[in-house]
Each structure stands twice: as structure tokens, then as C-alpha cells.
């Protein structure tokens, strides 16, 4: 190519194109990487150059040229493209490649109103000098290309109208650390800041979107999950809607318990009017959820919960599907059906399920969650009462309808309310679990509010993070990571603001945390065990025992230091009951691995000092944060060795960790013959996890006769999940062949934005 083209520089000046300069930058970006051809990137770039092209466009062109070469055979292009993108980001943020001094950067951002002014008030110049020495900007070069694009799109502070970037990744990490430990004593806080910075900047701890995009800014709401319960009256419905708007606007995903709302045709004011039923109010909730785009970072999303025995269930189950008309569909919410043992027994015995309006059957709704024995007694009593409006339906027909809609939409979720209360962190008589959250991994107590300032209501909040299993060398590594995670998240509860008063009361008195994992598939591959054949069971048992043990130990140590949470007496831990005491004993038939840690000593310490946090663990989806950490998603098997995610910058490709070394050890999703191996691992995890797990079921029609998934298979898997004590089921994924039709490779995963990347219970 001739050197005759002119370029327009960032300052507006024109000069002749300097191909040698481009060549040097590409060589720098390729240094130390394998299977990289600088000349190929140059050739792909040059054919797109034109006269007076801006240097910004040149940079974006060479980034895309490198990114387009990412493949199974040449995975290192994801790092070359990332380095070029980091170079570009720093030029946009700072006007140069070298980042400025931390103190002067913070001072400038506070003056611009971008950073929280407390950053300057809480730390001295000398402390910023010390923090600046902790920062290792070379760690930017460890990001994959997909990670850099996610950082740019969702996490780095920017003007979302003009696109101006204000910071780079290492400043994001050090300032999150500084904000979270600002209230610690001066003599110890620098130590915690450095340790936490090192853990998050090397991807050992993964943080959720609200924390990554919000901590250090003047907007202080970082709880990922918000659970709101609605009572059966207009005041509560309106208060619920108001709370939804407040939290959706501040980056949170929503779980809505609407199960108490009475059924269509129910009398109002002793028959003066009849009720319009659930659907109009679900539409009201949908409008509230979609009213805000969560600060430009993500769109609002919510899951609505209702009991299987609700009189309107046949109409509610079809709200998500593509049939019907606008009046009888509410498609932009997801739904979860709440089920207990009695309903399964009715199905297995070929009996009927009786449907009621909750308003017609006093105490039934309450006992459905809090007392299974009393629920059964009064359910049968109400069935026999001829004066109560009801409808009987064959149990198998109702379960088939549930599973048909779950298969059709993928977004009808399941909550086993008896497991959620019998195997809970909470004493179900004092703090009943009546719903979950957007992504089905949070199980916290809620109470309806009758107005937005109702101090007697309870909105549950959960603050999330995850441990990167792929980066631990020994289970003892989890001790330090658990300590840092618990301490950092606990500080967030005091650091953040609360848009609704009853949410603050709940968050501060319960101090619930949900710490999960990412990179489980890589962890299994590294240890040469698999999802499907049972070989991962013992490793999973040992790993999740260690996670829960060290999380509880960290919370107990914090309670010794700062005091236990004020509602600790409402937990099972207060009674000396741990998840290892209340788990479904059917798990023992699939895994006989013993406990390895000193639980008796930990019990004694918790009895003496209590716990700082009511809950510690929850296993959430982690699509976005896994990309940042170049990890596999949560506990899920990858669909392909390369994942592809659509973005405004085109298709983002990311290769699974250590692909070349571990290709034969990874078990891809559609290679797994059925759900049983995966569900058994989830059940083993649930033995230790004190909240719940976003567990999915997956079906490849090609494995079945006539490529039709038999209903009996869907029901069987549901029964297995219940039998093994699994609390919740999230997505049902059906292989549609889309990823097979990609022109790239058969082992490519196509990731679509879903409610969990747009909702906030993910990390």
C-alpha cells in the first residue's frame, strides 16, 4: 500500500499515514503471543483505509481485524485485539497510553462530578500515593477482547450520551477497593485495599454489574437482587410498582411475588364489584419494569411468582408465549411457578389438584410456605367445602401444561417452596421464604408493603460476588478469597443508599450476602472430571463444603469484630442448624463423600459470636462477569469452545480457558447425554449453599424419537430435581441448531442477551 494517504489525527491535524508506526503498534500487541500473524492483521486493515481517515478509525479498524481472526486454532488473537483495544481506550480516556497519577485522576473526576466526593475526603494525598503504588496497569493486558468490550460497554465510567470514557480498568478496581474499605481503621485499611485490589484485578473474585459500574460514583445502590412481595390490595400493588421503578432505575433486577392477588371474578367490597384478576396488574408491573433502562447500563427485568394452585394458573402459564393477543399476554416478564410436595404427590397418584383464589381460603397461602403439614390439612378441608369457589384439574394435565410452556418459552421457572423453607438459612416460623428473585438463586424473607414508606413491610436485598474456581490451586485458597468477599460485601450494606425505607431496614438487620462461583466448567476440565459420568461428584462436594465453611468462618470472625446482624435470632444458624444438617438426605445415595473440615469447632464459634450475615452463598448466572474474567459462565458447561456474543461493535468471540491444553477434557453442553449428571452436581452444591442455585435444564431434540422431547422426560427431570432437594430451576434451554449453522465452527456458542444479562441478579 502506498504511503500517499493522509490521516486526520485526534487533534484535527492532517499528516501522511505512517505505516511503520502501525506496524510497531501491532508488533507490541503481538509480543509473547502464539500463532499470531502481524502481516495478516495489517493486510486486513489496509484494504479498509481511505484518504483522510481518522486515526481513531484506523485504530478501530486494526482492532476489528485482529478480533475477526480469533478462532480455535488461533485463540491468542483475543489478547492481541484486547491490547489494541486497551491502547485505544486509554487514548480516549487520558489522551495518551500511560495512565495519570491516581490522586490527580481522582481529583479531576471529583471536580467533574463523576466520582463520589467522599473519595477525596476519606483519604489523604499520602494514602493515594500508597494506593498508586499498588496499581499494576500491566494487568490490563490480561483481558481478553470480549472482556475489554464488556468493560467499555458496561463498567468503565463514561458519558453515555457522548461516549466519552473517563477511566481505565485498574483505576476502576483500586477505587472500588478504596470505597469499600474506607470505614476501616487507618492502620489496617491499606492492607485490605491492597489484598482486595489484587484479588479482583487478577479475576480471583468477580463482582456484579451494580458494583463494577457504580461504586466510586455518586450513585450508591449496589444490591444486585431485589425481592418485592405484593399483598392483595390496591395500596400494596401501587407501592410494589413504585418500589419496582425506584430499583430498576438503579441497576437492580426484580423478583415480584404476586401470588396473593385474588383471581378473576372474586368479589370486591362484599360483591359491590368483581375483581379483574391478575393479568391487568401484571401488565402494570411490566410497565414499571420497562420504564427505566437502569442507568443506561442494562434494561429492566423481573420474574413474577405465583402458586401452582392459583385459580388463574391456566391463564397465567401462557402469558409468555407467542400465541394469543395483547390483551391476554404479558410477554416482557418472566414467571416462576411455586410447587410443593403435595402437588407432586397428586400427580404421581393420578389425582386432581384443586385451584383456589387465595382470597377465598384463609391461611392457605401462608401455610403453603411456612408449614407443610398445616397446608395439607386445610387444603383438603377447603377442597371439601362446597361453599368455596374452586376448580379441579388433573394434576398430570396441569404439570404437562407447566412443562409445555417451560419448554416453549424457556422462561417458566420452578420454585420448590417446601425445600426453600426446610433447607433454609432462616427459621421458617420467624422468617418465611415466599419467593425468589429474577434469576432464581436468592431465597430471602419478604413482607408486603402497603405504601412506599411502610416500615412494617420488607423488601429483601442481596449483594453478590463470585469466586473464580478456575484460579484456585488449593481449597485453602478459598479462605482468603472468602474473607475478602464477605468483608467487602458487608461494607457495601453501610456504604450504599436505599431508595425505599423497608429495604434499608431489611438489608441492615439481615445483612444477606450471596457469594457464588464462576469458571466451574474450567475447574472440572483442569481436574479431568466431567458433568455427566459422576466423576465430578466428590470434587464438587469437597469444593462446596470448603466454600461454605470459609464463608461462614469469615462471617463469624466479622461478627466477633463488629457484632452479629440484629436479626441473627431469626436464622437457623442461631439454632445451631446448618445446611449440612437440613439437606435432602437423598443426596447421600448419589455421593458418599464425607465432610473434611472442622464443623464442630465452627459451630461452637458461631454459637459464641454469631454471624455478621444471615446468608452467605447463592449460585448465580454470570454471563457478563465471566467474560471479564475470561472464565466459563457460573456452574454451566460451555456450549462451545468459542462463545460469540452480539454487541454494537459486532460479534465478540471468546475462547474457553486453556483451550489447547484442555480441549479433550472440557465437556460441552450438547455432548452431555441428559440432565441427570448436572442435576446431581447441583444437588450436591445445594447441600452446602444456604440460598439457592440458578440451575438450568437442557434438551437436544435430536436425541429423541422424531426429534420431539417426550413429556415424560420433562416430568422425570422435574421429579429428579425435587427428589434431590433442588430448590429452584431457572432456564430450560432447547438446542435449536442456531449455533450449528454458524459459519465459524461446530463448537461455537452463540450467546444472546437475555433477562439475566439485562437484569441484575447476575454478576
Swiss-Prot record:
Domain ATP-cone: 5-95
UniProt site (Interacts with thioredoxin/glutaredoxin): 756, 761
Annotated GO MF terms: ATP binding; ribonucleoside-diphosphate reductase activity, thioredoxin disulfide as acceptor
Family classification: Belongs to the ribonucleoside diphosphate reductase large chain family.
Site positions (Important for electron transfer): 730-731
Cystine residue pairs: 225-462
Protein name: Ribonucleoside-diphosphate reductase subunit alpha
Organism of derivation: Buchnera aphidicola subsp. Schizaphis graminum (strain Sg)
